[in-house]
UniProtKB/Swiss-Prot annotation:
Record protein name field: Serine hydroxymethyltransferase
GO cellular component, one term: cytosol
GO annotation terms (biological process): glycine biosynthetic process from serine; tetrahydrofolate interconversion
Organism placement in taxonomy: Bacteria, Bacillati, Actinomycetota, Actinomycetes, Propionibacteriales
Compartments where located: Cytoplasm
Subcellular location, principal: cytoplasm
Record organism: Cutibacterium acnes (strain DSM 16379 / KPA171202)
Pfam family, one: SHMT
């Protein structure tokens, strides 16, 4: 296999061809609102000169970015391909069909719904797909109605009460779940009577026996599996066994690790597609596409999910669906599979680099793309302080709660870091070991400032003189060896 750190000549050729178009585009924007053109240029500069370690971020290819900037943005297309509420949607039908075909082929799914604008939209669509299939459709049959519009007011009130009487379980936020998995402040926590499962307090690992115990006791309609900050893989075959035992639907949110599924890093019991009836994902993150979402289902749920509009959504973002199709086509290549494997390998290298320097990691390592650092135990800092100090040094991360977090969900005790973005730039294990050194150097030089109570504060901090600039310079030198969008010169 060729050196993964070498610049792809095809990518450079594309960038050089697109550079004049981007320069012209920015000049045109500047004539209307120069501050937006300036911010766009500044964002590229910032991304080129920062160590992007946010696990949910990546770099989409220039063809994907270019696809979003077309007149597809102007077209309304409520409905699905061939069944629109607007005329003149034949080209949108083509785009949506191609994107869905790529999604099914890439993941081995029976059906794909590619309209959701985001991961949250995908999860909402999935929840209501399940409710429509298991609650609404049987009720319509019971009441002798074809659609909800045909119900009497009494029957409609009965159905609404049934909707509101359903149960779901998902991974708790501090254990690594997502806010859409039943977090009370989120709409998902208000839609369902909800309970959360966590992780083993000693190991930080998912305890399947505890999940099964909760499911038997609570008897949910939906069991949500998946995570946003859990640094290990999930056995979806076990989760399906639990769901089947209690008559629940298994819904998997693979937004964070979809790229590792697409790239064949997660296979067998770790691949959710053969085991879950409903799977949601974003199309960015590790999948490296545009910002958006998808729902993949078995054929039994196809008709229900295709009613995402008007059930949850309105008009799809046609220009983004087109970009999804391009990104999914890219993900079907061997180049992407090689990339996905490097993402996982690099995450292990980063974990080893951090642990050998004395950093405490939740679960003592990783086998996906995420590392979760306990910065309170390791450095006496809150996640908020560590996040801000690292940003001062040109290292972009996000604070994150850890299991039974003593600092709560706002200040947190952890930071979450991931390898997809820097792997896209060509970083390998040696570079990620250097990244570990830069992180530790920064945080060892950071101390909490005293609060008005006389105790160490949770927000303010100070970094030893010169350390932030030293780390920033070292990061910039490292990044210079792996240019972002090489050949894209906007000067």
């Amino acid at each position: 296999m060729s050196d993964p750190r070498a610049v792809d000549p095809t990518a450079r050729d594309i960038a050089e061809k697109l550079a004049p178009a981007y320069r012209t585009m920015l000049d045109a924007i500047a004539q209307v609102e120069p501050r937006i053109a300036e911010a766009t240029r500044a964002e590229l500069t910032d991304q080129r000169h920062s160590l992007k370690l946010i696990a949910s971020e990546n770099y989409a290819s220039l063809p994907v970015l270019a696809t979003m900037g077309t007149w597809f943005s102007d077209k309304y297309a409520e409905g699905t391909a061939g069944h629109r509420f607007y005329a003149g949607c034949q080209n949108v039908d083509t785009v949506e069909t191609i994107a869905a075909e790529h999604a099914c082929a890439l993941f081995g799914a029976e059906h794909a719904y590619v309209q959701p604008h985001s991961g949250i939209d995908a999860n909402l669509t999935a929840y209501w797909t399940i409710l429509a299939h298991h609650i609404e459709t049987p009720a319509l049959s019971e009441f002798g109605a074809r659609t909800v519009n045909d119900l009497t007011q009494v029957d409609w009130d009965t159905l609404r009460h049934r909707f509101n009487d359903q149960r779901a379980i998902g991974m708790s936020l501090d254990a690594g779940g997502h806010l859409t998995h039943g977090f009370r402040p989120n709409i998902s926590g208000k839609m369902f009577d909800q309970r959360s499962y966590g992780t083993d307090p000693q190991t930080g690992l998912l305890d399947y026996d505890k999940v099964a115990e909760l499911a038997r006791e609570f008897k949910p309609l939906v069991i949500v599996a998946g995570y946003s900050a859990y640094p290990r893989r999930v056995n979806f075959a076990k989760m399906r066994e639990i769901a089947d035992e209690v008559g629940a639907v298994l819904m998997v949110d693979m937004a964070h690790f979809a790229g590792l599924v697409a790239g064949k890093v997660f296979t067998g019991d770790e691949n959710p597609i053969p085991h879950a009836q409903v799977v949601t994902t974003t199309t960015h993150k590790s999948l490296r596409g545009p910002r958006g979402g998808m729902v993949l289902t078995t054929k039994d749920y196809a008709d229900d999910v295709d009613r995402g509009c008007p059930m949850v959504l309105g008009g799809p973002l046609s220009h983004v669906m087109a970009a999804k199709a391009v990104a999914l086509a890219e993900a079907r290549t061997q180049t992407f599979r090689d990339y996905a494997q490097r993402v996982a390998n690099n995450a292990k290298a980063l974990a080893e680099g951090l642990m050998k320097r004395g950093v405490k990691l939740v679960t003592d390592g990783t086998d996906n793309h995420i590392n979760l650092l306990d910065v309170t135990t390791s450095f006496g800092l809150t996640g908020r302080q560590a996040e801000a100090a690292l940003l001062d040094a040109g290292v972009v991360t996000n604070r994150n709660s850890i299991p039974t977090d003593p600092n709560g969900a706002w200040y947190t005790s952890g930071i979450r870091i991931g390898t997809p973005a820097l792997t896209s730039r060509g970083f390998g294990p040696d570079e990620f070991d250097q990244v570990a050194e830069l992180i530790v150097t920064t945080l060892e030089a950071t101390t909490p400032m005293t609060a008005s109570t006389g105790k160490p504060g949770k927000a303010k901090y100070q970094i030893a003189d010169g350390v932030a600039q030293k780390v920033h310079d070292a990061a910039d030198e490292l990044l210079g060896n792996f240019p972002l969008y090489p050949g894209l010169d906007l000067a």
